[in-house]
Amino acid sequence: MTQQTFLVEIGTEELPPKALRSLAEAFAANFAAELDNANLAYGEISWFATPRRLALKVANLDEAQADREVEKRGPAIAQAFDTEGKPTKAAEGWARGCGITAAQAERLVTDKGEWLLYRALVKGRSVKELLAAMVNSALNKLPIPKLMRWSDKETQFARPVHTVTMLFGDELIEGEILGIKSARVIRGHRFMGESEFAIDNAEQYPEILQQRGRVLADYTTRKVLIKQDVEQAAIKLGGVADISDSLLEEVTSLVEWPVVLTAKFEEKFLEVPAEALVYTMKGDQKYFPVYDNAGKLMANFIFVANIDSSDPQQIIDGNEKVVRPRLADAEFFFKTDRKQRLEDNLPRLETVLFQKQLGTLRDKTDRIQALAGWIAEKIGADVNHATRAGLLSKCDLMTNMVFEFTDTQGVMGMHYARHDGEAEDVALALNEQYQPRFAGDELPSTGVSCALAIADKMDTLAGIFGIGQHPRGDKDPFALRRAALGALRIIVEKKLPLDLQTLTEEAVRLYGDKLTNAKVTDDVVEFMLGRFRAWYQEQGYRVDTIQAVLARRPTQPADFDARVKAVTHFRTLDEAAALAAANKRVSNILAKSEETLNEKVDVSTLKAPEEVKLATHLIVLQDKLAPLFAEGHYQEALVELASLREVVDAFFDNVMVMDEDLQVRVNRLTLLSELRDLFLRVADISLLQ
């Protein structure tokens, strides 16, 4: 069958830069699904995306669907004809649906009976007849949160559409996409190259767009080029560029013909904390800051223009002129904020609500102060410094700098606290209280910082759960999932001796009578244990391993971590599978039995050698394992328990647990209960698959 390259390009107004890549990838995935559903063979699908276009190029696409044989089984012969041999209504209705008469139907004969059968060869449709509908379907399924209408049309898309091009090889595919008829004309760069030109063959794309339209349509090519040029520009300045992937992606999505330029600002602005300057350069202007080899911010920045200008200095001057007022604002705010102490902002916190039912930010500050001190005492951190950090924790939210540059919260608190002469670990905690901010982010570095970070997160969890506003589905307006996982990561990775139950109880107690959910403590603990499950799954731990540990409901995160790792190691032992199966068998036996068990095994009632041997082993192991359990050495404990395999196997091979003698039966059930209890000190390994 003949194959050709298929091209579709949708020319638009400027698409949302933060969504551009995801739109293009979804377009490709959706169209691949359309091709699969249509039973069309195809090769590689390449996607292209610029601010003003989305495009797909499909290699080796079949010109038509393959012919296929269709079989439709009808009613059984007994139901298809009446006693006179005439077709029944059921048979006639089925035949009509197949486009034949009942008399024209074939017969399907099997060992189970005889049925009417329709068999036909369906000729595959030409791909040219299908492509427009498939493109429309793929576009309609794109994840676009807000759709736009334009002109007087009912069509909706992320941005107004101006051109559509669909080519199968050199043949134009006629059709209407998003209200626009397909044509050979595509548009070039707004200010360079040819504004419009015709494309003759799908194979010419994207090279023709680069040559005639001065547009680099390949997203990855643009991204790599920008990164390389920014790095080289920084080297020429004698520094290193701050190239975060998120900013690089956004800049790539903003330009069609990237030209990297360098600019500068006055040295005096470097007296302002670097974080504030970087915030406005990266967040507002999409510039790349530059640092010297010592990690200090330089008075230079790198930006990407969307034009190859004959006078680049004019573009540089324009960008320097734009950024200067923003940096001057930061300088003014910094100087103004330092005219009073950070602590002087406390009364203003009373004017800002944390949550209507939970009080103001000042109320939250008081709770965090108390909880941070309580946590600090538990983990051996400086209690006075922790309570001081708690008191100052939200004061920077009232400063001019944070009001204008919101993402500098925390870090500006740190700088202002240092200016006020606060202890260094207090100042550092004001910045680190929000860590970890995202997956893989660094954790607070000191005990005081850990105490404050956990206190802030637990106060939010207790409060929001306490008024019944826990996350539902994808909705999590208070970022409780992130708060829970952040607290857990700190406790686990810093190996802090904190218990979720008592920690939550203390956080709840500090709210007084504000909370309406009587089950708030249990709800928060269960929620956090649920985040454990998700976190460990993401790290590659098996679901049944996590469930085996969760069955014991350990509320100390560090203890939970030790158990998961111990069970994971246990699974590598040769004895693991047999002992897991034995525990499952024991669980089933005990669940079905109705007898009341003894407090302990009666040695005098033991008869069979195998049960005597098992009981003896358990007595020895109980003494040996006690200190291991006490110290949380679960891996060593499970290795010791693995030695029971042969004894347990021999017991089940030779001993009848449900003996007719009630005393013997109860004693054996008690023995099995003691066996299971030893494993349950770590996890319910009967749940292992």
Curated annotation (Swiss-Prot):
Question: Could you tell me the EC number(s) of this protein?
Answer: 6.1.1.14
Q: Give one GO term, molecular function aspect.
A: arginine-tRNA ligase activity
**Which superkingdom?**
Bacteria
GO CC, alphabetical: cytosol
What's a GO biological-process term for it? arginyl-tRNA aminoacylation
Keywords for the protein's UniProt record, in alphabetical order: Aminoacyl-tRNA synthetase, ATP-binding, Cytoplasm, Ligase, Nucleotide-binding, Protein biosynthesis
Tell me where it mainly resides: cytoplasm
Cited PROSITE patterns: AA_TRNA_LIGASE_II_GLYAB
Q: Which reaction does it catalyse?
A: tRNA(Gly) + glycine + ATP = glycyl-tRNA(Gly) + AMP + diphosphate
The subcellular location is:
Cytoplasm
Q: Which InterPro entries match?
A: DALR_anticod-bd, Gly-tRNA-synth_bsu, Gly-tRNA-synth_heterodimer
Q: What class of enzyme is it?
A: ligase
- HAMAP family for the chain: Gly_tRNA_synth_beta (MF_00255)
Task: Say which family it is in.
Answer: Belongs to the class-II aminoacyl-tRNA synthetase family.
For this protein, the record's PANTHER family field holds:
GLYCINE--TRNA LIGASE, CHLOROPLASTIC_MITOCHONDRIAL 2, GLYCYL-TRNA SYNTHETASE
Q: How does it assemble?
A: Tetramer of two alpha and two beta subunits.
Q: What is this protein called?
A: Glycine--tRNA ligase beta subunit
